[in-house]
Amino acid sequence: MNISRNEQRALHVLALGGRILHERDDRRKITAVTCVTREGMILSDFALETFLRLRRKRLIESRSGSPYCISKRGRLSVRAQLDNQGA
């Protein structure tokens, strides 16, 4: 599966315990997203388009309206990086 650099970066953040916070409009459509790391830092280059691509590929999931997190399929697709050791 082809995963862009921004998607890969977001998946690494999510794999290390990050979350994607989302806002909905009156029609229940997602209008804004923020990718937050485990430490509370915001991933600046994460856009709504990246979020929609990750969701379309089923690499992220949300259960019962909770923040989006990485799915099992996303964990299997993310490439290992030496500098992302979670500490």
From Swiss-Prot:
InterPro entries: YjhX_toxin (IPR018654). Belongs to the UPF0386 family. The lineage of its organism: Bacteria, Pseudomonadati, Pseudomonadota, Alphaproteobacteria, Rhodobacterales. Coiled coil: none annotated. It comes from Cereibacter sphaeroides (strain KD131 / KCTC 12085) (Rhodobacter sphaeroides). This is UPF0386 protein RSKD131_0371.
